């Protein structure tokens, strides 16, 4: 699994930060969280393949989070895309996509499936054998949702028990791995007889734009979140501005991360007012005095975060 931060800015882009967009690569598939203006150009500087984007998750319909969609849709059409593209977002997302497709001359020959998500209740919006995706309602100036991507880990085979029961590599072992009972020498063997509990999988939360919500932190804790990407539009001294605009400060984001039980928090959606990050770094240092175990990172454009927890400069 690898995260690529395509854009880490806020409402107004800067020389150093593009509008919000984050790619999550998992099992050869790309999941895109928000798609701000210039996203497709940012992708050029990474190893993200636009043709492998199957799902786009929109947190809310402010322009800085969605204005990259028209260009991306057209570009992947030019590249010959035929497989469906799924777009998830809060209420009015379908209307927005319809308006996009009705402006200009688009030749899009692949299916676009739009799924509107409630901004009032949490939902499991995707469920597969390998991963689940959840939405959670957050509080912003327009309907908004956060997302959680959770890897599904299957039970591991206990080779000692397998050997003890005399199960050989073959159809019986495969059936047990797939969750079915088998009969061996007149005895029924269940998957539970030969498996160990699954290891903890990777679970990534993305806040979108929001005020700090303890309810969101508790939801993340329930899902055993390991990495939280949380907006931190302002530093601690701008708390009044954060409250007025329904955003979060660095301290807000760090407190939510600590409450959620996440190992790592990555701060993003940095206001254009910050040419440098000394105020952010000061807030992080102060917080870590009392919470040294929390791994804190401030995202930068075109930075990657790998499964092994390492930053990679593109």
Curated annotation (Swiss-Prot):
InterPro entries: RibonucZ/Hydroxyglut_hydro (IPR036866), RNase_Z/BN (IPR013471), tRNase_Z_dom (IPR027794). The keyword Hydrolase applies. GO terms for molecular function: 3'-tRNA processing endoribonuclease activity; zinc ion binding. Zn(2+) 1 binds at residues 60, 62, 140, 209. Its EC number is 3.1.26.11. It catalyses: Endonucleolytic cleavage of RNA, removing extra 3' nucleotides from tRNA precursor, generating 3' termini of tRNAs. A 3'-hydroxy group is left at the tRNA terminus and a 5'-phosphoryl group is left at the trailer molecule. It is an enzyme of class 3 (hydrolase). Zn(2+) 2 binds at residues 64-65, 209, 269. Binds 2 Zn(2+) ions. Keywords: Endonuclease, Hydrolase, Metal-binding, Nuclease, tRNA processing, Zinc. Pfam families: Lactamase_B_4. The active site is at residue 64. Zinc phosphodiesterase, which displays some tRNA 3'-processing endonuclease activity. Probably involved in tRNA maturation, by removing a 3'-trailer from precursor tRNA. Homodimer. Belongs to the RNase Z family. This is Ribonuclease Z. It comes from Methanococcus maripaludis (strain C5 / ATCC BAA-1333). The gene is rnz.
């Amino acid at each position: 699994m690898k995260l690529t931060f395509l854009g880490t800015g806020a409402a107004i882009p800067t020389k150093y930060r593009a509008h919000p967009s984050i790619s999550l690569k998992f099992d050869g598939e790309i999941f895109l969280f928000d798609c701000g203006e210039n996203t497709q150009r940012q992708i050029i500087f990474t190893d993200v393949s636009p043709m492998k984007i199957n799902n786009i998750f929109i947190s809310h319909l402010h322009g800085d989070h969605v204005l990259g969609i028209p260009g991306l849709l057209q570009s992947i059409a030019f590249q010959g895309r035929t497989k469906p593209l799924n777009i998830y977002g809060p209420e009015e997302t379908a209307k927005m996509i319809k308006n996009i497709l009705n402006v200009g001359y688009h030749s899009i020959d692949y299916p676009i499936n739009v799924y509107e998500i409630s901004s009032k209740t949490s939902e499991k919006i995707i469920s597969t054998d390998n991963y689940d995706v959840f939405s959670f309602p957050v509080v912003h100036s327009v309907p908004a949702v956060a997302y959680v991507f959770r890897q599904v880990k299957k039970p591991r085979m206990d080779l000692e028990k397998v050997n003890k029961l005399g199960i050989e590599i073959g159809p019986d072992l495969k059936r047990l791995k797939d969750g079915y009972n088998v009969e061996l020498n007149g005895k029924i063997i269940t998957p539970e007889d030969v498996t160990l509990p699954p290891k903890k999988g990777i679970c990534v939360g993305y806040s979108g734009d929001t005020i700090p919500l303890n309810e969101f932190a508790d939801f993340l804790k329930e899902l055993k979140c390991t990495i939280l990407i949380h907006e931190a539009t302002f530093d601690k001294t701008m708390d009044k501005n954060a409250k007025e605009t329904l955003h979060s400060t660095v301290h807000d984001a760090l407190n939510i991360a600590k409450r959620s039980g996440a190992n790592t928090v990555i701060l993003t959606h940095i206001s254009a007012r910050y040419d440098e990050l000394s105020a952010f770094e000061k807030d992080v240092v102060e917080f870590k005095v009392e919470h040294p175990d929390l791994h804190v990172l401030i995202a930068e454009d075109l930075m990657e975060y790998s499964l092994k927890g390492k930053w990679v400069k593109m």
